[in-house]
Each structure stands twice: as C-alpha cells, then as structure tokens.
Amino acid sequence: MLCVSALLAGSAAPAIKNMAVIASAGSKLQDVPLAELAKLCKGAQKTWADGRNFTLVMKDPESPDMHVAVQKLFGMPGGEVKSAIAKLNEARTVVRVVESDEDLLRTVEATPGAVGVLDVYAINSAVKVLRVDGKLPFDVGYALKGN
C-alpha cells in the first residue's frame, strides 16, 4: 500500500516538457548554435547571417514550461525576462509573446525570420524543428531539455 501511495504522489509532480526551436517549414535554417540564438534573444545580434530580421515567438516566459528556455536564451530567471523583453521591443518587435500553441505556430509560419520555442508534442507540418548545436529535442545533451 505504501508503494502505491508513493507512486501516486510522485505522479502528481508536473512533467517537464521537451521544448523545440521551430521555424516555418520553408525556412532555410537547419541548425542554429545556442550561442547565436542567445545573442539574438539578448539583442546583441539583430539579424540572421543572411540579413533577415530575427523574431522569437514564445508563450509566457514566466511559465514553468519556459524556465529552461528562458535561462538558456536570455541568461536570466523568468521573473526578470519580461522587463528585458519590453526593452528589446522598444525599437522593433524582437520577441512576441503569444497565448497558445496554435498562435505560436501561426505566427512563426507567417513571420519571415521567426523562430519559436514550443513543446515538441504541439508541432504540426507548417513548421520544422531546428537542431540546436547539432542536436534535436530528444537527443542526449539537447540544450533546451528540462532535465
């Protein structure tokens, strides 16, 4: 009986989602270094190597699902990132925060140069998953893996 209650208690903990960096299906992007993504997210680099404007599309940066991505891409805790995003967006919208997975997918598909951070199980055929430092979301050592 004790084992069953321990199992039930353990299953109540929120699962860490596997997040993916996505781009529109027609994008030429394939593999993006984490260091380049971080420079783009922090505003140190404004455009992709081909000159297209960079836009990051994400859901609430303070949500538990986004914790690892915010840490890796912005180098700060979720509680501080909203003010950093507001500052980045003063001249041009660099980071778009959307309400749902569907909004994120639509925005990435419709915005040239956009990438999004999304739960791998929400991906559809309108987008493709980018490698980050040569790795996909389920590969060992993937940069945005929560555990």
Model-found features: residue ranges?
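Exported/periplasmic ABC-transporter solute-binding proteins
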Residues: 13-147
